[in-house]
Amino acid sequence: MGRARRTVRAPAQHDALGGHALARKSVRSPSRRLRFGRRSDPDMPPQAPLDEMNELLSLREVRTPVRLRFGRRSEERAVPHIFPQEFLTQEQDRAVRAPSIRLRFGRRSDNNMFLLPYESALPQEVKANGSVEDDRQQE
């Protein structure tokens, strides 16, 4: 007593080859057709002639300048990319180039770091008078 085997069948499809192999039409994706399509393809747009291409290239040369392309609207507010010398006077030039005193010598707390502990507590007059007395004693 053998059991009957149940077979699962695929839904009915058109069998072009008559056997178990199904013939499938290869479908090109539209992106490939647009990129690599042939001239005989009716879906392809016609190619632009050379004179139209030259016209398009000449239009590209007359584009907006770079300084106006990136959000700058008025020319009076526009800063030139390369600063000529007439824009900067000598005083402004010196002020721009001179480093600040803090960058040269550090903050006041940094300078006090090298003093002895009792020197920082003394007033300025005492320090000055003390140095004068030391000079007199040496003579």
UniProtKB/Swiss-Prot annotation:
Record's compositionally biased regions (Basic residues): 22-37
Tissues in which the protein is found: sNPF peptide 1: Expressed in corpora cardiaca (CC), corpora allata (CA), antennal lobe (AL) and gnathal ganglion (GNG) (at protein level). Expression in AL detected in all animals, in GNG in most animals, expression in CC and CA in some animals (at protein level). sNPF peptide 2: Expressed in corpora cardiaca (CC), corpora allata (CA), antennal lobe (AL) and gnathal ganglion (GNG) (at protein level). Expression in AL detected in all animals, in GNG, CC and CA in most animals (at protein level).
Subcellular location: Secreted
GO CC terms of this entry: extracellular region
Residues of the signal peptide: none
Chief location of this protein within or outside the cell: secreted
Disulfide links within the chain: none
UniProt superkingdom: Eukaryota
Keyword annotations from UniProtKB, A to Z: Amidation, Cleavage on pair of basic residues, Neuropeptide, Secreted
Family named by the database record: Belongs to the NPY family.
Protein name: Short neuropeptide F
Species of provenance: Agrotis ipsilon
